[in-house]
Amino acid sequence: MEVFILELVLGSKNITLEDLINVTRKGYKVSISEEAYEKIDKARALVDKYVEEGKVSYGITTGFGKFAEVSISKEQTGQLQKNIVMSHSCNVGNPLPIDIAKGIVLLRAVNLAKGYSGARRIVIEKLVELLNKDVTPWIPEKGSVGSSGDLSPLAHMSLVLIGLGKAYYKGELLEAKDALAKADIEPIPALSSKEGLALTNGTQALTSTGAHVLYDAINLSKHLDIAASLTMEGLHGIIDAYDPRIGEVRGHLGQINTAKNMRNILAGSKNVTKQGVERVQDSYVLRCIPQIHGASKDTLEYVKQKVELELNAVTDNPIIFVDTDEVISGGNFHGQPMALPFDFLGIALSEMANVSERRIEKMVNPAINNGLPAFLVEKGGLNSGFMIVQYSAASLVSENKVLAHPASVDSIPTSANQEDHVSMGSVAAKKSKDIFENVRKVIGMELITACQAIDLKEAKDKLSPATKVAYDEVRKIISYVSEDRPMYIDIHAAEDLIKTNKIVENVEKAIGKLEF
């Protein structure tokens, strides 16, 4: 039987968001093209030439940051590169998830494969070997200001290459030297000129973090449309608001796609209604689903464009231009081009939870829930039902509003004011991750609340084919709430169900791909 090895070849073409996820979550192998090797060798030769001739070049024959004016001798260049890795590894807090840490390794390898950094072959080969043998650097999540790039988290990554720090081997946390030994990887004996800087100067930590959030947010936006459709079923929502002509006269693609999703998901439902039958129009959280969800989708699409640029960007400093024999100091390490999009990502995610929570409130509030019992429970008063589910959702939405404050508008100068404007892009990326995790919980709450409303309406036999699929997936693991029970169990189960992506996968099997 022929075995096909799924592989990403660096240097042959630009990588995509999907490529990143294939390596970090699906175990795709990585290799280096001959074209990339040629570029790497040429850039390295120019670095060696600068060192031999004693030319002044930042980070090659000088110190770093405020020490840029301090000359470093040829004999000290290797120690200089080891020192930057050791002294800059200052991150704190919980470790980054393994997939995000793998992404950092991959993106640094992509960067070096461009041939503008001047590191030797062995450096990029060791990064690739880490990926292919499932050794992942242990990197605490806090400590980067996003300029000069992600110095501290990338230093933690780089420690592993020289046998220092900590690393995971097949998920087990070990001292780096032990993880390397188990994987049969030899550490780099010594870093050479420019290599410590080439490893640590860039935006790969913030980019990997934000890229993984973005990938999951795209799938979550589909869950949001499905949850909203279940709510429409439970509240007998008016379908007219999703008429394609409404989107066409405004023109926003996210709105158009969301309306299409809603029409397709609800096609065949005998619960939804038409305007003027039960009431003239719905409140905004139902009627404006295409406009609200769609605006977040448009934002995700914008962020995706920026992310896929940055996945392939040269973010080193200085940059080696072999065609003109120049080593030029610039600012490609500055995280501002990604800090702003990741702040925008957090805002878009926050709004997804905002509207979802309002639909939960609409279902549990007897004044506005179209005839459902208060808090969706029989024997109300004795039972509180879904009352506190809405409290929990409100708490998470409120937290998101705080987290949605942009990090990129802040700057605290570093390195004795040599680095006098920083991006805080790593903070923006981390915030988007924290917001995402809250949003996923809130959408899980809407799923279980909507299924409860459907049961109370005795409407499950009138569901559309697609909403019936989603309803059944929920009911496989979360039963109808006939009397009070610990609701956190159901909430966590709903979140875990979203993590599996089974609802989206099975709905798409039933009706075709949902639009993003």
From Swiss-Prot:
Pathway listed: Amino-acid degradation; L-histidine degradation into L-glutamate; N-formimidoyl-L-glutamate from L-histidine: step 1/3
Xref: CDD domains: PAL-HAL
A Pfam short name: Lyase_aromatic
Record field: catalytic activity: L-histidine = trans-urocanate + NH4(+)
Residues bearing PTM 2,3-didehydroalanine (Ser): S148
GO molecular function, one term: histidine ammonia-lyase activity
Taxonomic classification: Bacteria, Fusobacteriati, Fusobacteriota, Fusobacteriia, Fusobacteriales
Protein EC: 4.3.1.3
Per UniProt, location of the 5-imidazolinone (Ser-Gly) cross-link in this chain: S147-G149
UniProt subcellular location: Cytoplasm
Main location class: cytoplasm
Gene Ontology CC annotations of this record: cytoplasm
Gene Ontology BP term (one): L-histidine catabolic process to glutamate and formamide
SUPFAM superfamilies the record matches: L-aspartase-like (SSF48557)
UniProt protein name: Histidine ammonia-lyase 1
Record family assignment: Belongs to the PAL/histidase family.
Species this chain originates from: Fusobacterium nucleatum subsp. nucleatum (strain ATCC 25586 / DSM 15643 / BCRC 10681 / CIP 101130 / JCM 8532 / KCTC 2640 / LMG 13131 / VPI 4355)
UniProt KW keywords: Cytoplasm, Histidine metabolism, Lyase
Modification(s) after translation: Contains an active site 4-methylidene-imidazol-5-one (MIO), which is formed autocatalytically by cyclization and dehydration of residues Ser-Ser-Gly.
